[in-house]
From Swiss-Prot:
Full protein name: E3 ubiquitin-protein ligase makorin
Coarse class of the protein's main subcellular location: cytoplasm
Subcellular location: Cytoplasm
Keywords annotated in UniProt: Cytoplasm, Differentiation, Metal-binding, Repeat, RNA-binding, Sexual differentiation, Transferase, Ubl conjugation pathway, Zinc, Zinc-finger
Organism: Caenorhabditis elegans
Span of zinc fingers (C3H1-type): 2-29, 30-57, 138-167, 296-327
Biased composition (Low complexity): 66-82
Coiled coil: none
Pathways involved: Protein modification; protein ubiquitination
């Protein structure tokens, strides 16, 4: 293999990994006997496996220093014939006799230490006011954050530029300003307000833990459910059960809306259900909950206005709690909600808007005169015992009212 005229620097240093296949010149005359420098000081970790020579060089083959020396120094070293030994460095060990480390801020003060506030005060008011502040300046001092939490400050009282407050029994912190009565009174009022809020929350939680749903009979708090509070009564239900109960008028046509909109226990009508994490029974707490519920729903867009197909078809009209926002950002005022009415029996018997003549009505009255007399006799016997909430009472009342109106209109009353 052709070789370059350049000498192999790896072979010259003692070892070439390519051996005879190296393309550079391996000249023995240029090879330097690499002596292990670690062995010279007696600390070679490889031992016999080291690839460098573990021999001591002759006087004329001493290793050169890393820094270049002048020719005069080399000549003096060769002429002296002295053997140069490497300098032995001291071994690193833990000193058990060393002094204990003390942070600077814990060291005893050798002289007066002037804080930033003290330096500013001395610059403004002179040397006489550096150690004393007026009552107005003391009242404007900020509270020390370290002393406020634990009552302990790393600095001494005379060196800390902040005010060290007094202990507050309500919040159990050193938060009472020692010089400013206004700030001290303000903090006391805040603590009293927070304490009152925590007490009210504890009372609500105590009442909440004992409530069970009137439909599924489960403990609502233990099941991690929400309460469905009716605005018209004080009975307790979980939100899922009462919503399922109130949606039956859309699933089963046999149940009237008035029935499912009433409480399952007391039949008291309620217009809406309020979801809540705590049980609120009555009084100002319930009024506040209703106001918060309405304010919260005002920020949400009504589902009938979020869909393009049903936009503007909200059955609640301007009575809806949600926001009727149009795509352009404007608010639709809406109209009053229209009342929904189920089909009645009288609607199929008579039609007030029909254009039937008097002859048709007279013939119908003659044909059904006997049925009318029997119906009136039946009503006279049954009406005192009929329940005003029953469906029969409602239908009979509608028929009689229609007979009376039709007869008065045509002169047959």
């Amino acid at each position: 293999m052709p070789r370059h005229e350049t000498d192999c620097r790896y072979f010259a240093n003692g070892y070439c990994s390519k051996g005879n296949t190296c393309t550079f010149t391996h000249d023995v005359a240029t090879r330097n006997e690499n002596i292990c420098h670690f062995n010279l000081v007696g600390k070679c970790s490889y031992g016999r496996a080291c690839r460098f020579l573990h021999t001591r060089p002759r006087n004329d083959e001493l290793p050169s220093c890393s820094t270049p020396q002048t020719s005069q120094n080399q000549q003096n070293l060769q002429n002296s014939g002295q053997r140069v030994r490497p300098k032995q460095l001291p071994e690193l060990k833990f000193n058990a006799q060393a002094a204990e480390f003390v942070p600077r801020w814990k060291m005893p003060q050798r002289g007066p230490v002037t804080s930033y506030a003290g330096a500013a005060a001395s610059a403004d008011h002179g040397e006489s006011s550096s150690s004393f502040q007026s009552s107005h300046e003391q009242a404007q001092l900020m509270m020390c954050p370290y002393h406020q939490k634990s009552g302990d400050c790393n600095r001494q009282d005379m060196d800390c530029p902040f005010a060290h407050g007094n202990y507050c029994d309500m919040c159990q912190q050193w938060s009472l300003h020692p010089y400013n009565a206004e700030l001290r009174k303000k903090h006391e009022n805040e603590c009293v307000a927070n304490h009152t809020t925590e007490m009210e929350r504890a009372f609500l939680l105590q009442k909440t833990e004992q409530k069970t749903c009137g439909i599924c009979m489960e403990n609502i708090f233990e099941k991690n459910l929400r309460f469905g509070i009716l605005n018209g009564c004080q009975h307790c239900f979980c939100l899922d059960c009462i919503r399922q109960w109130r949606s039956k008028d859309q699933e089963n046509v046999e149940l009237a809306t008035k029935t499912v909109r009433s409480c399952p226990e007391c039949r008291q009508h309620s217009d809406y259900v309020i979801p809540s994490l705590f049980w609120v029974e009555s009084g100002q707490e319930k009024d506040l909950l209703i106001e918060m519920y309405k304010e919260n729903t005002k920020r949400k867009i009504c589902k009938y206005y979020s869909n393009e197909r049903s936009r503007g078809a909200c059955p609640f009209g301007n009575k809806c709690f949600y926001k009727h926002q149009l795509p352009d950002g404007s608010i639709d005022p809406g109209e009053a909600p229209s009342s929904r009415r189920r089909p009645r029996l009288v609607d199929f018997l008579f039609d007030d808007n029909s254009d039937s003549d008097e002859e048709t009505f007279r013939r119908f009255q003659e044909e059904h005169e006997e049925e009318q007399e029997e119906l009136l006799r039946f009503v006279a016997e049954t009406l005192p015992e009929a329940d005003e909430e029953s469906e029969l009472f409602r239908q009979i009342t509608e028929v009689l009212r229609h007979y009376q109106i039709s007869g008065h209109r045509r002169g047959f009353q």
